[in-house]
Amino acid sequence: MMLNSGDTAWMLISTALVILMTVPGVAMFYSGLTKRENVLNTIFLSFVSLGIVSLLWFLFGYGLIFGGDVSGIIGSHQVGISLINLGSASKYAPTIPEGLFAIFQMTFAAITVALISGAVVERIKFSSWILFIPLWFALVYVPVAHWVWGGGFLQNLGVHDFAGGIVVHITSGIAALALALVTGPRYDQKLMPHHLGYSVIGTGLLWFGWFGFNAGSALSAGSLAANAMIVTNTSAAAGMIGWILMDRLKTGKPTLLGALSGAVAGLASITPAAGFVDIGASIVTGLVAAVICYLAVSWLKPAAGYDDALDVFGIHGVSGIIGTLGVGLFAVPALNPSLTSGGLLTGSTSLLVSQLIGVVTVTVYTFVVTYILAMLLMKFKGLRVEREEEIQGLDINLHEETGYRLT
């Protein structure tokens, strides 16, 4: 198949959109939710994630994920930039150059790592985060991405993840939970957003960029991309309305933070399903994700006693699970030729079983490996800053900078 200029143009745009999601999207969304003494450090965690993962991706990440399968566990031993034939078509997307496919996939890895940082903001050592990034990327993201997208055993079992419900949201959410448990709670656990306006801008950039994230995962400009874009928007809208209603039921007043959280829950939940479900299913997915994520944040977290500071597990992890299982319920084969069977509502149970296997496998693997990795870092390096540094703020103590100079 020949390279297609229209598909190539769309994928160039989609790649840029997903980078925009990480910086400044995630960075601004997170920074607005923290105390003002930690705004720069919170932004820095996302920025440095993009930088480190961008280099690691072309050194070994791409080859070990997409360079050919070895026993269903990991990709080819061929690693490095030489593996990528920049001018030829990708075997995964035959109408775009392989180099473009490679950098598009790199953006997914970068945002996954950046998302994890939200669980441990305001207390993690910056130097420990720098060490965590390459270790977690190599030990968790790379194998999981190969299992699901690179011809690994989960893909061969029929697990479907259109744009990263498993690879991005479940891994980041579960890793965030494990890292938060090992790091321990902040001394002041109250969520005190210092500037919700930043979070509004960040959420807007996320919503905008998510069209590249999901519709771009069609890897071409056509009806599949159009469907993914539509259901992404409707799920985000349904999630936002769902969370507002939950706020209203519990407190009697809707909150802007709730609206932002619901929109992100809707976006995350439709990610694995965007290329497999119709508009009606996307609305149900977004609403269900909002309700369950609301309960995870407002009830499960305080009941269990963990300090996932910005609710990475409660929103991304839970939404990723809901959306992945939603594929097994609502998938419509007519929308995507890669589906060999539909969801449970079409009378088939096989896809739902495959999706459940994928969720359980990745959840357990991610939690165990991340927990062990965090424990090792805690033992040999230390994960969190000193009490006085945390109280005074990380911006001035770790970076000798301040986000605001008020005179």
Swiss-Prot record:
The entry's keywords: Ammonia transport, Cell membrane, Membrane, Transmembrane, Transmembrane helix, Transport
GO molecular function, one term: ammonium channel activity
InterPro entries found in the cross-reference section: Ammonium/urea_transptr, Ammonium_transpt, Ammonium_transpt_CS, NH4_transpt_AmtB-like_dom, RhesusRHD
Record protein name field: Putative ammonium transporter MTH_661
Similarity comment: family membership: Belongs to the ammonia transporter channel (TC 1.A.11.2) family.
Membrane topology: Multi-pass membrane protein
Subcellular location: Cell membrane
Gene Ontology CC terms: plasma membrane
Major subcellular location class: membrane
Lineage top rank: taxon: Archaea
Name of a matching Pfam family: Ammonium_transp
Membrane-crossing residue ranges in chain numbering: 9-29, 47-67, 70-90, 101-121, 129-149, 162-182, 196-216, 226-246, 257-277, 279-299, 312-332, 357-377
